[in-house]
Amino acid sequence: MVLGILRNLLDDNARDIKKLSRQVEAINALEPEIQALSDSDLQAKTPEFRRRLERGETLDELLPEAFAVVREASRRVLGMRHFDVQLMGGIVLHQGRIAEMKTGEGKTLVATLPAYLNALTGRGVHIVTVNDYLARRDSEWMGRIYRFLGLKVGLIVHGLDAAERREAYNADVTYGTNNEFGFDYLRDNMALHPEEMVQRELNYAIVDEVDSILIDEARTPLIISGMAEKPTEMYYTVAAIIPRLQPNIDYNVDEKAKVATLTEAGVAKVEKMLGVDNLYDDANMELAHHVNQALKAHTLMKRDRDYVVKDGQVIIVDEFTGRLMFGRRYSEGLHQAIEAKEGVKIERESQTLATITFQNFFRMYDKLAGMTGTAATEEEEFRKIYNLDVVVIPTNKPMIRKDYPDVVYRTEKGKFEAVVEEIRERHAKGQPVLVGTISIEKSERLSEMLKKRGIPHQVLNAKYHEKEAEIIAQAGRLGAVTIATNMAGRGTDIILGGNPEALAKEKMRQKGYSPEIIAAATAIKVDEGDPEVMAARQDYQQFLAAARRETEEEHRRVVELGGLHIIGTERHESRRIDNQLRGRAGRQGDPGSSRFYVSLEDDLMRLFGSDNLTGILDRLGMDDSTPIDHPLVSRSLEQAQKKVEAHNFDIRKHVLEYDDVMNKQREIIYRQRREVLTGADIRPTIEDMIKTVVDQTVDRFAGESKYPEEWDLAGLLDYAEQLFLPGCDREALANAIKEMEKEEVYGFLREKAMEAYRQREEELGPETLREIERLILLRVVDTKWMDHLDAMDQLRQGIGLRAYGQQDPLVAYKFEAYQMFNDMIASIQEDVVRYLYRVKVVQPQAERPRQVVENRYAGEASGPRQPVRREHKVGRNDPCPCGSGKKYKKCCGAGK
């Protein structure tokens, strides 16, 4: 059965490649004709293609010629000609699919083909990378092709102001990170004026390292938040009592599910220490939450594995890359609980203002495509969640890397000793070795062992920056030993013998040249009129010639030694991450090899491996230093990985099912908010709101009765005066209503409310009133949406308990979320009407600056991943967020 499915998938892929080959032949047939064009004729192709699109030609019809033009432009500007397999990858991306291309096959260059073709429509193309360094590098490097062909290139990175962002989004091709694109979408949907918005429509996105962004980061919510008014003392109080609890008596820990729970004895002990009668009483809900988070912080969150303490701050370690995630924070008070545990200053909790997950953000694009070296293992998830097919593109040259079988040891100590011994043997020969670890803790342990043996090496496990890319680029040099967390330096090729261009640029930096001069001097086309650039160019060429002589000799020797050798010190939960590590070797037909070392004490085997395994090995009498070669071990390893992959897929699918409910609500609110922001006249909307509020007020106080004498007339008049009839003649109204039927009352009060509304319009003037209406509506919607997000979050946290009452939690969540959404809409209408009839016009305030500080939160692996947070504070002189029209310091901020 499984073999049949696999055969079908392979057959499908072979059919795809055959079709793609025919399109590649059509592109290649145009090459002589395109090569014969002058630079100006080649550049004139862009306006010609645009005219042809206007006349009705499709992008698919333009594809062969457009791809041929990009290939020729790349050859002239960068000195790089797209291979046939790169053309195939480009076609797949244009079709809105995922191209799986092995490491070193030039994915960065592939993206230029569909990006150019789709940019011809004028609707914009977003190329999404995993970090600012790659976005900046690719926009400068590949940007030369687009600029040569007359397209504008934009770059979205952290630190740009609104005008710079708008300009970057208005470019034909925009490079940026997934976080920046997502945050700009959220900020645009919090804008109070159309000119504050920066993004255009979400037309076409090409996601580089698509598996990292759409799978690994899938559960990461992007969150814009403001400071919540919550005290921090309770965190310290609770942190002090947790160490006094005893494991397995007062609490139990399930590492596999990543859950820690108090036993009945533990609850009683905590209640006694905190001086409360019932920890789970309604009045103590917040206290119970503090206790649960503190327990998690002390038992499940490990220092130097999940986080580090640096300069008095708790900094999260990315579980996939091992990098320090500066600015990210765990959510729901977990980060504060860890800060209390470690005795550092506690930062205040935040309140969510706007949020979206990457899953839902990227599904909003009209067309989505991606590329990666490893996607086939997650093909089912890409298809089910994102409706994306995966096409495996063949390598340009045959893959000759040797992947050796895993070596399994009984203990971690025995495993690491064997790893160090293999590194020593290969280093002694001069063969470069790249060692992948899964945590900072493990990489530092291995580094200490290598130091004791006198083996020189580089360790990479910090925040991504250019230096890391350079070290990774030189990891193929003779005798190099590099220890890196599994994905550090992703996006940078390891060239056997070393990278001569990088070595030459390093020499120029040492000589004191600025980054701008280095970039100008190393370009294919140089400004010959600039003497400083020409002098730098001369130095670069000398350094490059010397570096080439050095690296060519090293390349020859490294190839003879078998190329780069990869050592994995532990199997990751996902086979895909293991394949990424392996993929660092054997690029572009180079030789290479890989081997994984595993111990039965590794988390994967300990938590998900076969329970029978240890007993069998005990009976066999295996010692720590003897590798285990048994089919049961290999089988157990593979089953453990499949088990975890299936478990993680189920979690992501489950999260999406819940998030889809919120997503539909978000789409409605943001769509209507955008209409208010950009629409010419919102008077009809306001009139509808007034009529709805009048009708709801009558229904609330009249109930089912048709007769006024049975109504709560005093309540009705109080509410009407409060909302839409300020300063009304209550006695006259009461007398009039007593003589009417219920249906007449609706019409009577509507007319009275509209009369008061028209009076407001005369007082303030139509133009002023429209602007006031717009601001009130936006402010009220934002405030209510913020409260709704908190309420939905609380509903979500507690909904799982419905299963105990034989209720499907998802069905219950959908039903209650729908009710809450309707209540929010009614509340928005009431508040808008109330403010509208009472607002006073004050002098306009200076436009407030956007103060946005990045601050991310993350949940444990079984819940949502680390949300990426950005915060902003209301300035004392800003308009108050409540919509009153007063300054914050004279309204809700009084006395603060």
From Swiss-Prot:
The gene is secA. CDD domains: DEXDc_SecA, SF2_C_secA. Gene3D superfamilies: Helical scaffold and wing domains of SecA (1.10.3060.10), P-loop containing nucleotide triphosphate hydrolases (3.40.50.300), SecA, preprotein cross-linking domain (3.90.1440.10). Residues 880-896 have a biased composition (Low complexity). Pfam families: P-loop_SecA, SEC-C, SecA_DEAD, SecA_PP_bind, SecA_SW. ATP binds at Q86, G104, E105, G106, K107, T108, D493. The keyword Ubl conjugation does not apply. It is a peripheral membrane protein. Residues 853-896 are annotated as: Disordered. PROSITE patterns: SECA (PS01312), SECA_MOTOR_DEAD (PS51196). HAMAP family: SecA. It is an enzyme of class 7 (translocase). This is Protein translocase subunit SecA. It comes from the Bacteria. Its cofactor is Zn(2+). GO terms for cellular component: cell envelope Sec protein transport complex; cytosol; plasma membrane. GO terms for biological process: intracellular protein transmembrane transport; protein import; protein targeting; protein transport by the Sec complex. May bind 1 zinc ion per subunit. It is found in: Cell membrane; Cytoplasm. One of its GO terms (molecular function) is protein-exporting ATPase activity.
